[in-house]
Structure formats: structure tokens, C-alpha cells
Regions:
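Amphipathic alpha-helical packing segments from all-alpha helical-bundle domains
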Residues: 116-159, 177-192
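Amphipathic alpha-helical interaction segments
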Residues: 25, 67, 92-96, 152-160, ...
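Hydrophobic alpha-helical connector segments
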Residues: 71, 82-110, 124-129, 147
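Helix-turn-helix
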Residues: 25, 29, 33-67, 71
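Amphipathic, non-transmembrane alpha-helical scaffold segments
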Residues: 19, 69, 73, 77, ...
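Short, hydrophobic secondary-structure boundary micro-motifs
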Residues: 43, 108-113, 173-177
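N-terminal intrinsically disordered/low-complexity leader segments
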Residues: 1-21, 170
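Short hydrophobic clusters on alpha-helical segments that form packing/core surfaces
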Residues: 22, 26-34, 76, 80, ...
Length: 193
């Protein structure tokens, strides 16, 4: 009887590992398709073809395009938290965040998933990673988070960075005569002063 109890987890591990590898392959394929066509134009059928899966197979991993976009954006948030933690200081974290966000169209594309209000695991994963990214920004910038007002400051700073990324990505920042470095320096002085 004990032998059976030991074998069951061993049988599950390869299946779980295979499922995780398949999910990773789907996300990698989705990122390639998004790079070619834009995240907003992403389709489950196109991702399935890129990943070498039957289109229906993707529904075992993601209920719809919104969930797939949320998963991509959650991965981008993990990368964002990492670069901000490694950058040191508000100016360094801001520049690193802006560089990453300029190329992360998935965040903007995923915003439509929130409007649909479907919730679920994908949204919970995104929210958890968003909190981790906000914490990394707070830590890197030295901003405290002990009060509601301080937490608002961190969210305002993150919102400013997201807006700057949108302006930079669309070419509007340069068209207005500003550089990312100049804007980050101004943010740094406003939040430090």
C-alpha cells in the first residue's frame, strides 16, 4: 500500500512538468506572434499554429485571448520587478522600467481583459505580480509604504512611468521635445524633494 502512495506523486510529476512545459511553449509562441503582429492582433489560432498545437488545445491552458494576454503581461511584470530591483535608486529603477515598458505592448493589450471583468486565476496572477512590481519600485526608490498616503505615492509613480512608456512608445515624448532621462530625473526630484 505504501508503494502505491509513493508511485502516485511520481506519475503526476512528469504530467505536471509536461503541462508546465506546454504552457511555457504557448507563452513563448504568443510572445513571438505578438512581436510580429502586435499584442492587440494576437489570436489563439495564430498562437496555436506558432506553438505547433491544435487550436482547441490552447483552451486547456487559457480560456480565451484575454487570459493569454494577462499571462503575458504578468510575465512582463515579473521582469519589470526584477529590473527595478537590480537598478538601484528611483532614477535607475525608472529608466529600467521605462526601457522595459516601452517594449511591453502586452500590458496595454491586456487592459481590455480587465474591462471584460472575467476575473479568475489569470487576473489574480496579474494582480499578484503587479503588487510585487509596486513593492520593487517602492524598495528601489526608497519610498515608504507604511501608510495609505505613501502607497498612493508609489502607485502615482508607477502610473507616471506607465504613461511615460506610452508616450515614448508612440513617439509623443520626443515629439513634445522631451527625453526619457529628463522625465525620470524630474520624477526623481519630485518624489525625493
Amino acid at each position: 500500500m505504501a508503494d502505491v502512495a509513493i508511485r502516485i506523486p511520481k506519475e503526476r510529476r512528469p504530467r505536471d512538468a509536461t503541462r508546465a512545459a506546454s504552457r511555457t511553449a504557448i507563452l513563448d509562441a504568443a510572445r513571438r506572434v505578438a512581436a510580429r503582429t502586435g499584442a492587440r492582433e494576437l489570436s489563439l489560432r495564430g498562437v496555436a499554429a506558432e506553438a505547433g498545437f491544435a487550436p482547441a488545445a490552447l483552451y486547456g491552458y487559457f480560456r480565451n485571448k484575454d487570459e493569454l494576454l494577462l499571462a503575458l503581461a504578468a510575465d512582463d511584470l515579473t521582469a519589470l520587478a526584477r529590473v527595478m530591483r537590480d537598478a538601484g535608486g528611483l532614477a535607475g529603477a525608472g529608466i529600467a522600467a521605462l526601457d522595459l515598458l516601452k517594449g511591453a505592448e502586452t500590458m496595454a493589450a491586456a487592459s481590455g481583459a480587465f474591462a471584460a471583468g472575467q476575473g479568475g486565476d489569470a487576473e489574480r496572477l496579474f494582480n499578484g505580480r503587479l503588487i510585487a512590481a509596486l513593492k520593487a519600485l517602492s524598495d528601489a526608490s526608497g519610498l515608504p509604504t507604511g501608510s495609505r498616503a505613501h502607497q498612493c505615492d508609489v502607485v502615482l509613480l508607477a502610473s507616471a512611468l506607465a504613461g511615460l512608456a506610452l508616450f515614448a512608445r508612440s513617439g509623443r515624448l520626443g515629439a513634445l521635445g522631451f527625453t526619457p532621462d529628463e522625465m525620470i530625473a524630474r520624477l526623481d526630484s519630485r518624489f525625493r524633494g
